Amino acid sequence: MQIHYLEIVTKEVDAVCAAYASANGVQFGDPDAGLGNARTAALAGGGLVGVRAPLRETEEPVIRPYWLVKDIVAAVAAAVQAGGEVAHPPMEIPGHGRFAIYIQGGNDHGLWQL
């Protein structure tokens, strides 16, 4: 299993980015509109960590890993068969690939296909 995107939703984007940058020696870029205005940095071994503000007033802070999969439709079907509930069906993000979100065990889980 490989995390392709680690999404961190927080009301303190700059503070979180500064703490991660200081502790890990990474640099966060400018907000990426395609990723909800997340500021991103490279993960060791590939992928990105993205820190963004909530997109709506009701969105709670969350840390959500997106697992890299070869077939996102099949992966979503497998998650549902295992008891997961689809929170966001597969959707294309131009230039980034496709993502989906499901909830299982009270946690958000993401899937990502390049």
What are these model-derived regions, one by one?
Residues 12-13, 72, 107:
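A generic "binding-loop/recognition-motif" signal
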Residues 43-61, 65-69, 80:
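Conserved, structured core segments of small domains
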Residues 1-3, 59-62, 88:
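A short, structure-level motif marking secondary-structure boundaries and short turns
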Residues 4-8, 29-30, 76-77, 82-114:
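Vicinal oxygen chelate
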Residues 39-43, 51, 100-102:
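Short beta-strand element of the conserved SAM-dependent methyltransferase core
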